[in-house]
Amino acid sequence: MADQLNMAGLSVGGGGPGNGPRSYIPPHMRGKVGGPGMNGPQNGPQNGGGPPGHDGPPSSVNNGLNNSAWAGNQNHDARGGNWGNQGGGPPPRNNNWNRPSFNPNAYGGGNQGGGHGGGGGGGYARGSGDGQWRDGKHIPGPVNARVERELFGTPDDPSKQHTGINFEKYDDIPVEASGHDVPEPVYTFSNPPLDDHLISNIELARYKVPTPVQKYSVPIVMGGRDLMACAQTGSGKTGGFLFPILSQAFKTGPSPIPATNQGPGGYGRQRKAYPTSLILAPTRELVSQIYDESRKFAYRSWVRPCVVYGGADIGSQLRQIERGCDLLVATPGRLVDLIERGRISLCNIKYLVLDEADRMLDMGFEPQIRRIVEGEDMPNVQDRQTLMFSATFPGYIQQLARDFLKDYIFLSVGRVGSTSENITQRVMEVKHRDDKISHLLDLLSTHGGGLTLIFVETKRNADELSDFLQNQNLPATSIHGDRTQRERERALEMFRTGRCPILVATAVAARGLDIPNVTHVINYDLPTDIDDYVHRIGRTGRAGNTGIATAFFDMKDNSGVAQELLNILKEAKQDIPPFLETAARMKSYGGGRGRGGGGRGRGGGGNRDFRKFGGGGGGGFNGGGGGGFSGGGYGGGGGGYGGGGGGYGGGGYGGGGGGSYGNPGGGQSWW
C-alpha cells in the first residue's frame, strides 16, 4: 500500500513512529532537504494525477487526444516513485543527486548551524545565509553544490526558467522616469553599483543583462531614492527591488539588535525578530515566490530571508523567525498577527517594498497596510526607503503614494496596461459553450509542448472543465479558492513540474505568480476588466521568452471589453479579427456599461505620474467629486469604488458616469 501511495516522491507510509499526524508543508519547502523523516501529505488523491479531490486520468493511457503532445511517453498517474523520474517531469539529476522527498519536519530545522555569529540556525533558514558579518566585513560562506542545484537548477532544468531568446529586445521598450535628479541607468551587472557577491549570485541564476526596470531601479534605490515603478508583467520587478536591497545589505551589514532582546552573548536565538527589509505582497503563493528568489540572491551571505503568510502553521513560522530574520517577505494579515504577538518589530526597517500594491488594496488590505506602515514602530517616511512595484498603478494607488513615499521617482517601463510583444495574441469568436469546448480541444490537440494555463471565471467552471479534460485523457488539474492551501500548492507543484501540464484556474493564478515554461494561456472565459486580461496573459512570454495567448470572445457576453481588447491588440501589433472591430464599433454606438475611462488605471493615466498630469480632488478609492487625472480618469464624475451617482454609467467606452469599480460580471472571485 505504501508503494501505491507514493505520490510524486511523497512517501505517505514513511513517517515517524506509528505514522502519526503529518505537519503542514509550506510552499517554499517543496522539494527541500533537511530534518528527519520524509512524510507525505496527510490527505490527497490516491488514484491519479488530477486535481486534489478528483481522480486523475488512468495510468494506462498511452495516447492522448489525436496523438497530441500530451500523449505517448508521459505517465500522469500520481502514483509511483521519485517524481524526477516520472514522464513529463524534470529530467533526472546528475552527480548521483536526486530530488529529495517533501519533508514537513524540516521547517526551520536542519543541521547547518550558525547564525549572525554562529548560533542555532539550520535547514532552509541557513540555506541562503551561511555567510557572516565580522569586524565590519562581509564574509561569504563556502560553496554548497547541493544548495546551488536546489536554488539555481541546471541549464537544462525545465523547472527553472532562464533568460529567454528575446531578452535583448527589451532594449526597444520605452522607459519614462519622472522626478528630479533621476540617475543614469545601468546596462550591465557590475561593480559599481552592485556588490561583487550579489553579482556572483546573479551569474549563477544565468541572468546576462538587466531588464529595463532593473536598469533604472538599481541606481535609483542604490542612490537612496524612493520609487514607484510600473512595468510589464514578467519584466523582472522582483530583481528590481531585491538586487539593490541585498547589495546594500552586503556592503553595510546588519543593524544592531536592541539589547533587551538579545540572547546569550548577544546572538543566537531571539524571541523577537528585527528585520531590516520588509516586502509585502497580497497572496501566499506570491510571497513564497519572492522568498525563493531572495534565497537565490542571498546565497552564501549573512542575510537571512524569512517568509510568513496565513494558512500555514504559525508555530513553525515563529521558530523560523526566532533563528534570525533580516529580510522578511509577508502577507499583511499574518504580519499584523505576528506583530500583535510581540514577535516582530519593525523599528529597524530600512527598506519597505509593496509588491502588487494595487491588488493588495483591491483585496481589502488597506487597513492592515496602513497599520503596518503608520501604526506600529516602523521608521517614518523620512527615515526609510519605500518602493512600490506593480503592473498597474491606478489613481487611488498614486494617491496612496503621497502618504507612504517621499520625493520619489516614478518609473514607467513600457506602456503599463499593455502586453508584451513576446506574446502572440489570438482572439477566436464563439457563439455558445459547445464552440468553446470544440476550440479548446483543437488547441490542445495541436499543442507543441510546455504548460497550458486555462482561465475561467467561476470555481464551478474550473472543476467542471478540469474533470471534462481528464475524461478526454488529458492531464489536467484545477486551482481556485475553495481548494485548501495544501491542495492549491500540490496542484501548482504538479503543474510546474509537468506532471499535469494543463491547469484550469480562476483569478488566484492571474497575478504575480511566476510559473516557468508556460507556453500557452487560454482565456476560456474573458474577464470583465481588461487589466485582468493583461495580467492573465502575462503568465506566458515571461523573462523574454515567447508565448501564445488565446481568448474566446462571445459577442453576447464580452462586448463590454471589445474596444479595450482591440486597443490591446493594436498596441502589441497583433492581428485584428474583423468580428472584434465590429463588436467594438457596435458597442461605441450603443452606449451601455462603460468603465469610465477604461478600467483600473487604463485610459485614466495609470502609467503616468499624476504629479505631472494633475487631477481632481475627488475620484480616489471611494469615488465622488473631482474626476481624477485631468477629468474623466479614475473615478471620474462620481464613480470610483462606491462613489455616488456613477453606477455602471452610460456612454460606452470611456463614457461618462464613471463606471463602477467593482465586478460587473458577478462571477469573478479573487480566488
Swiss-Prot record:
<keyword id="KW-0963">Cytoplasm</keyword>
<feature type="region of interest" description="Disordered">
    <location>
        <begin position="1"/>
        <end position="141"/>
    </location>
</feature>
<dbReference type="InterPro" id="IPR001650">
    <property type="entry name" value="Helicase_C-like"/>
</dbReference>
<dbReference type="GO" id="GO:0000390">
    <property type="term" value="P:spliceosomal complex disassembly"/>
</dbReference>
<keyword id="KW-0694">RNA-binding</keyword>
<dbReference type="InterPro" id="IPR014001">
    <property type="entry name" value="Helicase_ATP-bd"/>
</dbReference>
<dbReference type="GO" id="GO:1901195">
    <property type="term" value="P:positive regulation of formation of translation preinitiation complex"/>
</dbReference>
<dbReference type="InterPro" id="IPR000629">
    <property type="entry name" value="RNA-helicase_DEAD-box_CS"/>
</dbReference>
<dbReference type="GO" id="GO:0033592">
    <property type="term" value="F:RNA strand annealing activity"/>
</dbReference>
<feature type="short sequence motif" description="Q motif">
    <location>
        <begin position="187"/>
        <end position="215"/>
    </location>
</feature>
<feature type="compositionally biased region" description="Low complexity">
    <location>
        <begin position="94"/>
        <end position="105"/>
    </location>
</feature>
<feature type="compositionally biased region" description="Gly residues">
    <location>
        <begin position="107"/>
        <end position="130"/>
    </location>
</feature>
<dbReference type="GO" id="GO:1990625">
    <property type="term" value="P:negative regulation of cytoplasmic translational initiation in response to stress"/>
</dbReference>
<dbReference type="GO" id="GO:0031047">
    <property type="term" value="P:regulatory ncRNA-mediated gene silencing"/>
</dbReference>
<dbReference type="GO" id="GO:0002151">
    <property type="term" value="F:G-quadruplex RNA binding"/>
</dbReference>
<dbReference type="GO" id="GO:0016887">
    <property type="term" value="F:ATP hydrolysis activity"/>
</dbReference>
<dbReference type="GO" id="GO:0005681">
    <property type="term" value="C:spliceosomal complex"/>
</dbReference>
<feature type="binding site">
    <location>
        <begin position="231"/>
        <end position="238"/>
    </location>
    <ligand>
        <name>ATP</name>
    </ligand>
</feature>
<feature type="domain" description="Helicase ATP-binding">
    <location>
        <begin position="218"/>
        <end position="411"/>
    </location>
</feature>
<dbReference type="GO" id="GO:0010494">
    <property type="term" value="C:cytoplasmic stress granule"/>
</dbReference>
<dbReference type="GO" id="GO:0003729">
    <property type="term" value="F:mRNA binding"/>
</dbReference>
<feature type="domain" description="Helicase C-terminal">
    <location>
        <begin position="422"/>
        <end position="584"/>
    </location>
</feature>
<dbReference type="GO" id="GO:0002183">
    <property type="term" value="P:cytoplasmic translational initiation"/>
</dbReference>
<keyword id="KW-0347">Helicase</keyword>
<dbReference type="Pfam" id="PF00270">
    <property type="entry name" value="DEAD"/>
</dbReference>
<dbReference type="InterPro" id="IPR014014">
    <property type="entry name" value="RNA_helicase_DEAD_Q_motif"/>
</dbReference>
<dbReference type="GO" id="GO:0003724">
    <property type="term" value="F:RNA helicase activity"/>
</dbReference>
<keyword id="KW-0378">Hydrolase</keyword>
<dbReference type="GO" id="GO:0031370">
    <property type="term" value="F:eukaryotic initiation factor 4G binding"/>
</dbReference>
<keyword id="KW-0067">ATP-binding</keyword>
<dbReference type="GO" id="GO:0005524">
    <property type="term" value="F:ATP binding"/>
</dbReference>
<dbReference type="InterPro" id="IPR011545">
    <property type="entry name" value="DEAD/DEAH_box_helicase_dom"/>
</dbReference>
<dbReference type="GO" id="GO:0051880">
    <property type="term" value="F:G-quadruplex DNA binding"/>
</dbReference>
<feature type="compositionally biased region" description="Polar residues">
    <location>
        <begin position="59"/>
        <end position="75"/>
    </location>
</feature>
<comment type="similarity">
    <text>Belongs to the DEAD box helicase family. DDX3/DED1 subfamily.</text>
</comment>
<dbReference type="Pfam" id="PF00271">
    <property type="entry name" value="Helicase_C"/>
</dbReference>
<protein>
    <recommendedName>
        <fullName>ATP-dependent RNA helicase DED1</fullName>
        <ecNumber>3.6.4.13</ecNumber>
    </recommendedName>
</protein>
<feature type="compositionally biased region" description="Gly residues">
    <location>
        <begin position="589"/>
        <end position="612"/>
    </location>
</feature>
<comment type="function">
    <text>ATP-binding RNA helicase involved in translation initiation. Remodels RNA in response to ADP and ATP concentrations by facilitating disruption, but also formation of RNA duplexes.</text>
</comment>
<keyword id="KW-0547">Nucleotide-binding</keyword>
<dbReference type="InterPro" id="IPR027417">
    <property type="entry name" value="P-loop_NTPase"/>
</dbReference>
<feature type="region of interest" description="Disordered">
    <location>
        <begin position="588"/>
        <end position="612"/>
    </location>
</feature>
